[in-house]
Amino acid sequence: MAVIPMVVEQSSKGERAYDIYSRLLKERIIFLNGGVEDEMAKLIIAQMLFLEAEDPEKDIYLYINSPGGVVTAGLAIYDTMNFIKPDVSTLCMGQACSMGAFLLSAGAKGKRFALPNSRVMIHQPLGGYRGQATDIQIHAQEILKLKEMLTRKMAEHCSQPFEKVAQDTERDNFMSAEEAKAYGLIDDVVTKR
């Protein structure tokens, strides 16, 4: 089990200890670190809704270091990013692959960033299913619908033609931070705050 550092904050009321993530949440920073899955999505969504309730006018900062993960969990985060009033600024630190790259590109226009040594990877959704032939066919049709929808949305976020994004996501497509900027996945590569 990972050790989560604690930070102590001094105020006129005395001292208060926070775990580091709670302290950063006070600064409106949310971490998407690791595989995108339902439990993580639930926490990120709750944090976004909390921060919106605290101040609907101030930006939220989503820091991403993710190999990707479950499409439906990622879409729940994506829909919440679009549902809430505050802009969500995204920052890739480390890697943003698959659903991580999709969420990175979905940040507010002009507020999508990557650190200089970050890696971004886009591809088509992955899936697998076992069972009766008819059920396999149903699941295959569903993943093709998801592929079309994700490609269309990424094309919108990147200001790229649908056909180009469809072609570029046929296989794993790795990019440096500068290449991700040129593609339109992010707006800038940042080295300092």
Swiss-Prot record:
Keyword Cytoplasm on entry: yes
Top-level EC class as recorded in UniProt: hydrolase
GO molecular function: ATP-dependent peptidase activity; ATPase binding; serine-type endopeptidase activity
EC number from the UniProt entry: 3.4.21.92
Keyword hit for Nucleotide-binding: no
GO biological process assignments: protein quality control for misfolded or incompletely synthesized proteins
Top-rank lineage group of the source organism: Bacteria
Active site: 98, 123
One GO location term (cellular component): endopeptidase Clp complex
Xref: InterPro entries: ClpP (IPR001907), ClpP/crotonase-like_dom_sf (IPR029045), ClpP/TepA (IPR023562), ClpP_His_AS (IPR033135), ClpP_Ser_AS (IPR018215)
Reactions this protein catalyses: Hydrolysis of proteins to small peptides in the presence of ATP and magnesium. alpha-casein is the usual test substrate. In the absence of ATP, only oligopeptides shorter than five residues are hydrolyzed (such as succinyl-Leu-Tyr-|-NHMec, and Leu-Tyr-Leu-|-Tyr-Trp, in which cleavage of the -Tyr-|-Leu- and -Tyr-|-Trp bonds also occurs)
Localization per record: Cytoplasm
Keywords of the record: Cytoplasm, Hydrolase, Protease, Serine protease
PROSITE patterns reported for this sequence: CLP_PROTEASE_HIS, CLP_PROTEASE_SER
Classification via Gene3D superfamilies: 2-enoyl-CoA Hydratase, Chain A, domain 1
Self-association and partners: Fourteen ClpP subunits assemble into 2 heptameric rings which stack back to back to give a disk-like structure with a central cavity, resembling the structure of eukaryotic proteasomes.
Family: Belongs to the peptidase S14 family.
The protein's role, per its UniProt record: Cleaves peptides in various proteins in a process that requires ATP hydrolysis. Has a chymotrypsin-like activity. Plays a major role in the degradation of misfolded proteins.
Name of the protein this chain belongs to: ATP-dependent Clp protease proteolytic subunit
